[in-house]
Amino acid sequence: MIVGLSNPKKKYHKTRHNVGSWYIYSLAKNYLSILKEEKKFFGFTGCLNIKSNFIRLLIPDIFMNINGFSVHRMASFYNISLNQILIVHDDLDLAPGIIKYKYSYGHSGHNGLRHIIKEFNTKVNFYRLRIGIGRPKNKNEISSFVLSIPDFKEMKLIKKSISYAIKENFTLLNLIQ
């Protein structure tokens, strides 16, 4: 299962905090998968078949700080454990254009991840794809920064990193299996 963390509503779609959903939309488009609204999972879902691996996709359609409800609901329904899920999210500690895969336990201050960990109520490592969005100079501006739209240069770097990450999914699938 691959989850792209996001906030709902059209006004947040292009914000830095929603880069996880950008990834899922790009991945679905790349593999000709259709995302559809699934109210029982509080989000949009799809499926991929990559190298004979059936992979479920999820974009929660609820606010970031409660994305765990959506992730846990879908994972429980399909009997998927947290360590079998790739969570794709924005990362303030990486510059735009930088991505990093991580397999560990923890949220690094990210409220979406924090809520997922709370909902699963288990201390296990899980996969994360961290997509760099950069950090504002003033730490008091973090909330407004993540809820703002990247400038043209940043957007180009972020989209390029997402394209690269999608090409590297085959490598990641070998790790998950």
Swiss-Prot record:
Protein localization: Cytoplasm
Alphabetical keyword list: Cytoplasm, Hydrolase, RNA-binding, tRNA-binding
BP-aspect Gene Ontology terms: protein quality control for misfolded or incompletely synthesized proteins; rescue of stalled ribosome
GO CC annotation, single: cytoplasm
Site (Discriminates between blocked and unblocked aminoacyl-tRNA): 7
Active-site residues from the entry: 17
CDD domains membership: PTH (cd00462)
Positions with a binding annotation for tRNA: 12, 63, 65, 111
Enzyme Commission (EC) number: 3.1.1.29
InterPro entries associated with the record: Pept_tRNA_hydro, Pept_tRNA_hydro_sf
Any one Gene Ontology molecular-function term assigned to this protein's record: peptidyl-tRNA hydrolase activity
Catalysed reactions listed for this entry: an N-acyl-L-alpha-aminoacyl-tRNA + H2O = an N-acyl-L-amino acid + a tRNA + H(+)
Domain of life: Bacteria
The keyword Zinc-finger is assigned to this record: no
Presence of keyword Hydrolase: yes
Alphabetical list of Pfam families matching this protein: Pept_tRNA_hydro
Annotated site residue numbers, Stabilizes the basic form of H active site to accept a proton: 90
Cited function: Hydrolyzes ribosome-free peptidyl-tRNAs (with 1 or more amino acids incorporated), which drop off the ribosome during protein synthesis, or as a result of ribosome stalling.
UniProt subunit comment: Monomer.
Family to which this protein belongs: Belongs to the PTH family.
Protein name, as recorded: Peptidyl-tRNA hydrolase
